[in-house]
């Protein structure tokens, strides 16, 4: 009997350790805010002595980004450019739209987070499994085992690896001395089974380039209020560095 009790204590202790290790590992590895910004395509602008920029910053996400244009303007000015309010007087146009700024799942790219979640479930299963060994005190042992699993689940619930992602489409136009001809083609839906094709041709004096900027902020128990300023700063820096 004494041996069985000792084995039960050892198994429960192991269960608690296993169920809590995922949460502890997450808390340690993700205690500091990590920020990463990537651009889908490189934009090469021709060297020019003109240093005037017109900004048009939009936000179609559900988050407040009212200070974003100011940050981008400051970053552009820090590069030695003048921000103007008239597009006709600007050599460069920078147009950007924040498509989405929200919490996004990183489980597919971070397998260690999956293992952390599995820890609590394994704890509950191990606790219930003790019943098969110690049938003389099945009720008490099952209760202890499930309690151990619930402790692990509670620990995992308190420690969450959170990643916020901001996705921004960017278009930059630069003036050129040559005449630029642009052919536009648009397919407009007509009901559920048809489409209308629209084509147009225009001439101008601008070359236009498009890219997408993806910024990530990752930290344990991260709130958007903490992620927002660094995401905005990263986007502003990335856009300004194109110039």
Swiss-Prot record:
Alphabetical list of Pfam families matching this protein: TraT
Lipidation (S-diacylglycerol cysteine): 21
Record-linked InterPro entries: TraT_complement-R
GO CC aspect terms: cell outer membrane
Segment forming the signal sequence: 1-20
Topology of the protein relative to the lipid bilayer: Lipid-anchor
Keywords carried by this UniProt record: Cell outer membrane, Conjugation, Lipoprotein, Membrane, Palmitate, Plasmid, Signal
Lipid group attachment sites (N-palmitoyl cysteine): 21
Compartment(s): Cell outer membrane
Role summary: Responsible for preventing unproductive conjugation between bacteria carrying like plasmids.
Family: Belongs to the TraT lipoprotein family.
Protein name: TraT complement resistance protein
Gene: traT
